[in-house]
Amino acid sequence: MKIRWIRLSLVAILIIAVVFIGVIGFQKYQFSKSRNKVIMQMDRLMKDQDGGNFRRLDKKENGVEIISYIPKTTEKKDNEIIQKEIGKATDAEVKKLNRDKETQGIIFYTYQKHRMAEQAISYKAVQSEYVKEGRTKFVLKDKKDICKNIVTDAETGALLTLGEVLIKSNQTKLNLKTAVEEELIKTGDFSLKDVGNLGKIKSLVKWNQTDFEITNSEIILPVKIPGAPEPKKVKVKLADIASSVNKRYLPSSVKVPEVPKAKTNKRIALTFDDGPSSSVTPGVLDTLKRHNVKATFFVLGSSVIQNPGLVKRELEEGHQVGSHSWDHPQLTKQSTQEVYNQILKTQKAVFDQTGYFPTTMRPPYGAVNKQVAEEIGLPIIQWSVDTEDWKYRNAGIVTKKVLAGATDGAIVLMHDIHKTTAASLDTTLTKLKSQGYEFVTIDELYGEKLQIGKQYFDKTDSRMVK
């Protein structure tokens, strides 16, 4: 009896052992199946994203599998920049592991790829960590970017700097600074009182910097804003700075807005300063509309605020709006910060009412020097015909001066704050029309993108500010 009991016990133990081994084996099978499934999913993800244009590297450290996907260039070579970033992340992770050799996990190093143009590719390397949950499956524990966005040449795989993607010039720096200021104004995060501080953004462009991102439509820059603890990523439309982008890296999908051009060879641009005025500007607009004439208004930001709706009407009726400062000081006698205040407050005032930023600027009294022109950050529009309407306050004299100075390509200076100027307009337009003139805005007069730091007097007379 005792022997029989012993035999039964041994059989039971054997059965339990077999079952235990079977369970363990099944768990290992399920675990292996789960592991293979995760790897297959990641392989499929990368093939779907990049068509298999990569090389997979596998290794094991401290019980953890590390699987890396290295992209290839158009020359079918490993992208050394991405490989280096993944290598640094791998080394750092291995140092942190210190896990028991029985601990099992998988760390994937993948990349997100975005072609910005035929000759440039934007990459971001990503780490995904899977760990064992229970005894039979893997689950995603953590996913994170392991490096900043990297822009490389599609052909060579070489890391691109901002100075290679953009055209190295002072004009590029000025264009980009103005574009960034406007994008920040659009956010609505800056009050009228504080918006001038955006002018303090300096050293925005460093030609050797690589910490930028680029898409098919935007370039994204980290910008240190005065008073802000961390840099802010600012998106600038490539179409807005297309003239400053190296053609090799400018996406063909970017549509650069065409500058309207005049239809005839006898053109004249009428311009009005110091408005809008609630008592005069509406009458000026009525007369222009009646004659189907377009003009350019250089507005004061303070007057835009005091007379809401008029600058919007100017734009809606097809006129161009430029800046004339906030409250008409001589900018060459102001501090740098005050120049920023004068310009950016006006930009914000016009944008808040219209969704539009003035693209040109006429400094009060025409006073400008090289430093102020760069601080303004907009092309400078001067004039070739001064009616001196502010001095004479006589409608007949205003008309006479316009007619005496009128030539093809002339820019005429008037003010839409004087009733005598408004009264002169009907006769002035009628007589100019009889002489065959086409009335154009400043943009139409030149028919091309104007330069920051340059001043324009008429169609044939433009020069860099000194």
Curated annotation (Swiss-Prot):
Membrane topology term: Single-pass membrane protein
Residues that hold Zn(2+) according to the record: D274, H324, H328
Residues passing through the membrane, by range: 6-26
Binding site for substrate: Y365
Cofactor or coenzyme needed: Zn(2+)
Pfam family, one: Polysacc_deac_1
GO MF entry, a single one: zinc ion binding
Record-given protein name: Peptidoglycan-N-acetylglucosamine deacetylase PgdA
